């Protein structure tokens, strides 16, 4: 994607990463969530599912649907999502409040099962964070062109998750997940949220 500028100044005058729009939801996401380290298993599971659902769409589309996703996906409780039967899957596929893509809905259920299998073996939080050495990787790119779509770490995470049975976890999706979960901090230099 091409942005007009590496930084934008919205109504409050604070400089932000150039991908942020004046949409209050998007601005709050950028300021309060994106690039902030998360180690809560529920939050990480939710992000992994939502990033997969976002594939091919804009993130603001998912943000606008997130509250409804939380409702119909039982608060992203992997134990509950893993038990979804065909009737529940069909109801999700026709629900206008989420992305109505059968493959993504079915992948969400399969990913919940894969998450539970991983959790039975080891701590999923430690597993996910191990791909960045257990600590946030702060990149501080000079501009948006320096923000990669994928990295060797996201490629390794993608391969590991796929091996465990996860779907919609390609290296680009995994990098977006790493950014969203704060495993990677790619706020551009000059952004008010750049630590």
Annotate each language-model stretch with its function.
Residues 1-195:
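HhH-family (HhH-GPD) DNA N-glycosylase catalytic core used in base-excision repair
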